[in-house]
């Protein structure tokens, strides 16, 4: 059974990739094993795709371009981005992003469900 999804809910503020991006210092990056670096890459690219789905970007962040090219090096936190001491605001932004991603996926599931129901109805008519 499908659950109702409200499409009228709007975010109070736009979510940007920088709101959910994580940056490591050179020292932190140096102690990461390859599997951790690969996980970091995958998570950052997934976060970017989710943000881009909800709020289409005007340009691709340098971190994302770097990761897509397969380069493995640390990035320092850009000026104006949340500091680690302000993790709470970043976490709230991340949760908002996940909420809207969930809503978008729910809408897509509903659309796909209707398509399959209509397809079944069409096939039943053709058989009759």
Curated annotation (Swiss-Prot):
GO biological process, one term: regulation of DNA-templated transcription
SMART domains recorded: KRAB
Superkingdom per UniProt: Eukaryota
All residue ranges annotated as the KRAB domain in the record: 15-86
Positions in coiled-coil regions: none
Disulphide bonds in the chain: none
InterPro entries linked to this entry: KRAB (IPR001909), KRAB_dom_sf (IPR036051), Krueppel_C2H2_ZnF (IPR050169)
Name of the protein in its database record: KRAB domain-containing protein 1
Organism of provenance: Homo sapiens
Biological classification of the source: Eukaryota, Metazoa, Chordata, Craniata, Vertebrata
């Amino acid at each position: 059974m499908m659950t109702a999804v409200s499409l009228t809910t709007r975010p109070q503020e736009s979510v940007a990739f920088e709101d959910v991006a994580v940056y490591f210092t050179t020292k932190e990056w140096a102690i990461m094993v390859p599997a951790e670096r690969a996980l970091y890459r995958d998570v950052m690219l997934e976060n970017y795709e989710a943000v881009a789905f909800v709020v289409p970007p005007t340009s691709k962040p340098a971190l994302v371009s770097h990761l897509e090219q397969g380069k493995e090096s640390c990035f320092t936190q850009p000026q104006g981005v949340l500091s680690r001491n302000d993790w709470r605001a970043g976490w709230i932004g991340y949760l908002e992003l996940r909420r809207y991603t969930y809503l978008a996926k729910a809408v897509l599931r509903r659309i796909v469900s209707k398509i399959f129901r209509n397809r079944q109805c069409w096939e039943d008519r053709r058989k009759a």
